[in-house]
Amino acid sequence: MIKYIVQGGTKLSGSVTISGAKNAAVAILPATLLVSGPCRIENVPDISDVRLLLEILRDMGAEIRRYGRNTLEIDCTRARNATAPIELVRRIRASYYLIGAELGRFGHAHVAMPGGCNFGVRPIDQHIKGFEAMGAMVEQSGGYVCADAPKGGLRGGHVYLDIVSVGATMNILLAAVLCSGMTIIENCAKEPHIVDLANFLNAMGAQISGAGTDVIKVRGVKALHGGCYSIIPDQIEAGTYMAAAAAVGGDVLIENVIPKHLDCITAKLREIGADITEYDDAIRVESAYRLHRANVKTMPYPGFPTDMQPQITVCLATAVGTRLVTEGVYDTRFRYTAELGRMGANIQVEGKTAIIDGVQTLRGCEVRACDLRAGAAMVIAAMCAEGMTLIEDAHFIERGYEDIVGKLTALGAHIRRIETYETPSVSEDAG
């Protein structure tokens, strides 16, 4: 079990380097199953979700070498089509990318339903719709998804996604790259990590066009070859440190970013009063005064990201006035507001909207991280608060943030990590 102890009240100052994108890495690692030969992947974030996926790939027979903290060489040439251990798959939502990758490589996939964060109904019906459009037979039974390609292999198909789905867009890409013919995916998600996955696959010999637009076309190829690739910086990690600097106050230079990916976050933080300067590959955030009020609605990219919703809510919790945060992607993502309420925040949730009446200060107490991004929000709130805060279940935070304690400590925060070796209780949002 992992806990953080945070002493609030210290402004942040200095620079922080952003790691590789979690949401790209957790799709690119399963994608190596499609490649004949070694893939050297740089800027891989050292986070627990990545470590779990590497365990799964090793169990399937992948040869994996690590060079330093953030470079991997993965060779899945001799990988076998095996059912991944359920105790690993159930701990990570992104394990569903194994379905597309295994179906594309072996023509068969048998994968346990994934775990990860739980903030509403997140079915995989759009993934299945895409696989079936390529001729696969898909069944869900006993907590598993079983998919089989037709005799002769997957064939190109035309898929219109009923909702904009990041996971479905990426999973269908994985299944389509080695199939025969052309696959067209309409109403695609456009997030930077989708473009990064497509760029990785193209670097290995795939023929994908249109990633980052509404329509992606995949012309199937017979094989992919090994190569080198560097994962893009993490948009959400960068946004989290931007929000922390704005909420806590101070002067922080956030390095190794792609400012274009952060446009909507930058615009909203400027609207609430942060002073932001953009450079070619860095962003500086300065904040010296109490933040202003602003309404926020999460949307698919290029809108304000749902993965930044808890962090911006913390910014508004101590801002002047009353404002609304509306969740436009998931059914519910406000469980963490009860934890903020324990710290003195005044937040009322009505359906998919949180009504926030800003308070002067938060106070330290004992809270828990209910999921990855909510956990990051708890850390920001704890740094804003008067006194000491104990954050339970901090293992959620380490699913997606590399060395968050070390990075924040370097910025002047007073935060300590405590790990005990109890067996964590099993819960529906474990992972």
Where do the protein language model's features map onto the residues?
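Short, structured segments at the rim of ligand-binding sites
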Residues: 1-431
